[in-house]
């Protein structure tokens, strides 16, 4: 996890004074080319920041009810597993607002590199990719689509950090969105023999075609997300409570312990 992510997590624990917040944000290498004192820019990067009062900031997700939240269900296909060496070849996403699907994003990404194994897995051809939009244009479109919605995916860290790395390389700044893993959410809310996407959709009776195509996988993940929400505990009410509930218990305890032992500066 990035140090930047740990600091954003700190904002879920208590509001943070403006002066401390800006001073800290200036320290992160990922934000060295970002005007961190422009809140509209931070929101464009995905941070759901809002004013707590005239002196401090907090996160909108702390008070937004789940059914009024914005969730962007994302899936990517890549020509390899390493962001430093490989590239995204397709992005698919479904936007959920107020409990309903309200939009879709889908695009192939231009490249001249497509291993045979990836072509066989996805059905995407090299010719299709050679005539697709450039990576930078697709990333720009995706950033405008997701805005500050919660980034949701099945095995979320892979998709999140792959996209974030590519955004940074393109000069667009990193992702700062809150994120949620539907694998962890499903494990908390759905009894199933396996929790891979294809296994879950089969178990739940969700129609699932074109596995390993980004938009279709995102749509299937959205259906798993909706099914899981039917079984969340009554006390889980806000978007941030849902994110916290989703995390494995030992991970939550570790974060809470780290936050208590490393809190510095002046916070409300």
For each predicted feature, which ranges?
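Short, conserved glycine- and acidic-residue-centered signature motifs
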Residues: 35, 87, 214
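Ordered, small/hydrophobic-rich secondary-structure cores
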Residues: 1-23, 157-184
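Short alpha-helix plus adjacent loop in nuclease-associated cores
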Residues: 179-197
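N-terminal accessory regions of nucleic-acid-interacting proteins
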Residues: 1-69
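Short, glycine/acidic-enriched loop or turn micro-motifs at the edges of active sites
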Residues: 78-80, 184, 220
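Acidic two-metal-ion nuclease catalytic site recognized across multiple nuclease folds
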Residues: 2-4, 11-16, 20, 52, ...
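Acidic, divalent-metal-coordinating active-site segment for phosphoryl/phosphodiester hydrolysis
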Residues: 213-226
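Conserved non-catalytic scaffold segment of RNase H-like nuclease domains
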Residues: 58-60, 69-164, 169, 176, ...
């Amino acid at each position: 996890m990035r140090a930047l992510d740990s600091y954003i997590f700190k904002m879920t624990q208590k509001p943070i004074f403006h002066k401390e917040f800006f001073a800290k944000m200036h320290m992160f290498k990922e934000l060295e080319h970002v005007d961190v004192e422009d809140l509209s820019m931070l929101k464009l990067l995905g941070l759901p920041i809002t004013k707590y009062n005239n002196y401090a900031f907090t996160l909108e997700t702390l008070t937004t009810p789940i059914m009024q939240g914005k969730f962007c269900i994302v899936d990517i296909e890549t020509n390899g597993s390493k962001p430093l060496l490989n590239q995204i070849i397709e992005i698919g996403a479904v936007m959920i607002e107020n409990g309903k699907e309200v939009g879709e994003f889908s695009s192939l990404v231009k490249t001249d590199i497509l291993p045979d194994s990836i072509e066989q897995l996805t059905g995407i051809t090299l010719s299709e990719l050679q005539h697709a939009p450039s990576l930078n244009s697709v990333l720009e479109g995706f950033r405008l689509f997701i805005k500050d919605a919660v980034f949701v995916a099945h095995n979320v860290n892979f998709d999140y950090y792959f996209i974030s790395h590519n955004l940074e390389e393109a000069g667009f700044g990193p992702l700062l969105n809150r994120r949620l893993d539907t694998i962890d959410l499903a494990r908390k809310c759905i009894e199933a023999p396996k929790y891979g996407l294809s296994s879950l959709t089969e178990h739940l009776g969700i129609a699932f075609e074109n596995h390993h195509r980004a938009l279709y996988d995102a749509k299937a993940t959205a259906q798993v997300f909706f099914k899981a929400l039917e079984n969340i505990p009554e006390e889980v009410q806000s978007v941030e409570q849902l994110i916290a509930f989703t995390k494995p218990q030992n991970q939550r305890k570790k974060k809470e312990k780290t936050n208590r032992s490393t809190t510095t500066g002046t916070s409300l």
